[in-house]
Structure formats: C-alpha cells, structure tokens
C-alpha cells in the first residue's frame, strides 16, 4: 500500500481518507506485535504541550522513545517565551521547526494546530488536541481498539455519552467512523452539551442514521460500542458544570441488557461518569484502549516520517 501519509500534517481526522486510516491501523497492529526500536533513529521530535496532559503526552513520548527517536519540548506553556514574554505561536513554531523533524502540539485554542502547520516550514505537525476542536491521534487509537474488539469498523451501533459539545474526541471519532458503511450513532447528552451542528450536518449529508437520547438505559441493548466522556469542568462555567456532571453515570446495573460484544471506551481521565465496579465487567475496555495509544502513535509517527516501510 502506497504511503500517502509521508510528510503529511496530522491536524484533523477529516484530512485522512479511508485508505490512510487503514494504513495506520495495519501499521499499529504490526507494531503491537513487533518492536521497531531503530525505525526513527537520529530523528528529533518536539513535544509542545501548551495545555495540561497526562496520557496523550506520555503516550506520544513513549512512542517516540520506542521508535528510537529523541524528544525535546515542554509540558507547561506558561514557562516559555510565548507564555512569559508574549511571543506569538507562529514565531514559536517557526523557531522550533528549525530544530526538529516533527512537532507534536497541544494548545487550548481551536485551530492552533492548523496555524502551526502554516509556520512550521514543512516540518510535519501532529495535533495532540486543539481546544474543543480535534484530537486525531486519539481517534486513531479509538479506531484501532474498536477494530480489535469488533473485527470491523462498519455495520456498528455506536453510542457517545456525556459532553458531546466540547469533547473533541467524539467529534473526531464520529467523523472517522462516518467514512465506513452502515454505522449508526446514538448521542446521549444533556441539552446544553449536544453534538455540534457541523457534525450533525455531516451525518445528514452522508445519510448516516443518528438520534439523540436522554439516557443510556434506553439504548444499551442495541449498541456495540459505548463511548463515555467526562463533563469537562475546564470548558464550562460552574453552574453548567454542576448541572451536567452527575446526570450520565454508568453503573453495572445499566449493563444487564448489554450485548455480549459490547465494549465500553473512554478517552480518560475518568471522574465519576463510570462507576469503579464497571471496571470488573467484561465490557470495560478503556484501560486497554489507553495502552493502544502507544501503538497508534508509533504508527502515525513512523508513517509520516519514513516514506518506505517493509514488514
């Protein structure tokens, strides 16, 4: 399969076609069973996190190390010139791009990753989350996990629960799964946190079935994937947060009518939207999902930075 991802910016999952998604998934599966410790030897990658992160940052950095590359960067944007001296993001990226072979960026501003790509002088940009907009590498690991557990990415019933308005992971995942045939979407959220119109409009245009629901119980017997999200305190005012956070909590009792193949996913961190007892059910898959992030990020890093792959 031709590697059309070589030197490509990974900004939005919508920028990748279905063949490119399949290429990443194939490479992820390969790297999960066969280590490639020298694949990116002598490459230097910048990890630029202007917004707090645990799993995404450490997963990316682990992926970089396991491929044999070196990593530089920061995990707190307030301690660099952009934060302390007022340097623009474009200037920061222009300078960093002269040091490295790729830049991983997380930034609270929507559109920041695409802006960074305009000033990176051809150095590939990997979007690790830009505000409430996109989180493409999370989507790649989500797709990898879904395919591992369901053996397909089509003909699935997918429920997304919680903060669908600000949750960038559900935006990206819906766009990706919309590329595959006969998927149906069940959106469960408070009225104030429904899926953005641009996602709903995209599904309408593709003639993909979707519907809003008020609770998980009414759909649990119909779904293959239950994608839970936390209500994001950092993106809501205190009144809205208090109203929404406790409305959508998954208990083991909710799962009594679940399909045998159901898998529960979550981008993490979990707060209180999944009861701890759910962890011990055969449906809980969120920690395995998080572990898959290393392989998916290894895959996309290697495909963007190395043109030819032999396996």
From Swiss-Prot:
Catalytic activity: carbamoyl phosphate + L-aspartate = N-carbamoyl-L-aspartate + phosphate + H(+)
EC code(s) of this entry: 2.1.3.2
Pathway assigned to this chain's UniProt record: Pyrimidine metabolism; UMP biosynthesis via de novo pathway; (S)-dihydroorotate from bicarbonate: step 2/3
GO biological process, one term: 'de novo' UMP biosynthetic process
Residues where L-aspartate binds: 85, 168, 230
GO CC annotation terms, alphabetical: cytosol
Gene3D superfamilies from the UniProt entry: Aspartate/ornithine carbamoyltransferase
Binding site for carbamoyl phosphate: 55-56, 106, 135, 138, 268-269
GO molecular function: amino acid binding; aspartate carbamoyltransferase activity
Any Pfam family hit: OTCace
PROSITE patterns linked: CARBAMOYLTRANSFERASE
Keyword terms: Pyrimidine biosynthesis, Transferase
Signal peptide: none
Job of this protein: Catalyzes the condensation of carbamoyl phosphate and aspartate to form carbamoyl aspartate and inorganic phosphate, the committed step in the de novo pyrimidine nucleotide biosynthesis pathway.
Complexes and interactors: Heterododecamer (2C3:3R2) of six catalytic PyrB chains organized as two trimers (C3), and six regulatory PyrI chains organized as three dimers (R2).
NCBIfam families membership: asp_carb_tr (TIGR00670), PRK00856.1 (NF002032)
Family from the record: Belongs to the aspartate/ornithine carbamoyltransferase superfamily. ATCase family.
HAMAP family documented for this protein: Asp_carb_tr
Name of the protein: Aspartate carbamoyltransferase catalytic subunit
């Amino acid at each position: 399969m031709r590697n059309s991802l070589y030197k490509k910016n990974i900004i939005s999952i919508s920028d990748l076609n279905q063949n490119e998604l399949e290429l990443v998934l194939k490479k992820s599966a390969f790297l999960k069973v066969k280590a490639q410790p020298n694949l990116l030897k002598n490459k230097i990658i910048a990890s630029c996190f202007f917004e707090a992160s645990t799993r995404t940052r450490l997963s990316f950095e682990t992926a970089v190390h396991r491929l044999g590359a070196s990593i530089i960067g920061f995990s707190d944007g307030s301690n660099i010139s952009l934060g302390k001296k007022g340097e623009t993001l474009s200037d920061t990226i222009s300078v960093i791009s002269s040091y490295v072979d790729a830049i991983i960026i997380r930034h609270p501003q929507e559109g920041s990753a695409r802006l960074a790509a305009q000033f990176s002088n051809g150095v590939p940009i990997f979007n690790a989350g830009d505000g409430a907009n996109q989180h493409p590498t999370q989507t790649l690991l989500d797709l990898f996990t879904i395919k591992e557990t369901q053996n397909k990415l089509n003909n699935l019933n997918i429920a997304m629960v919680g903060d669908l308005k600000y949750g960038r992971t559900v935006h990206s995942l819906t766009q990706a799964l919309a590329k595959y045939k006969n998927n149906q979407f069940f959106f469960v959220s408070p009225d104030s946190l429904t899926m953005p119109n641009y996602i709903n409009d995209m599904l309408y245009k593709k003639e993909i079935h979707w519907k809003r629901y008020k609770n998980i119980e009414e759909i649990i017997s119909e779904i293959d994937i239950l994608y839970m999200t936390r209500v994001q305190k950092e993106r809501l005012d205190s009144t809205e947060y208090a109203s929404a956070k406790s409305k959508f909590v998954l208990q083991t009792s909710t799962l009594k009518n679940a399909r045998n193949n159901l898998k529960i996913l979550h981008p993490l961190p979990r707060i209180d939207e999944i009861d701890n007892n759910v962890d011990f059910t055969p449906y809980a898959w969120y920690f395995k999902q998080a572990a898959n992030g290393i392989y998916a990020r290894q895959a996309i890093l290697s495909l963007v930075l190395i043109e030819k792959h032999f396996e």
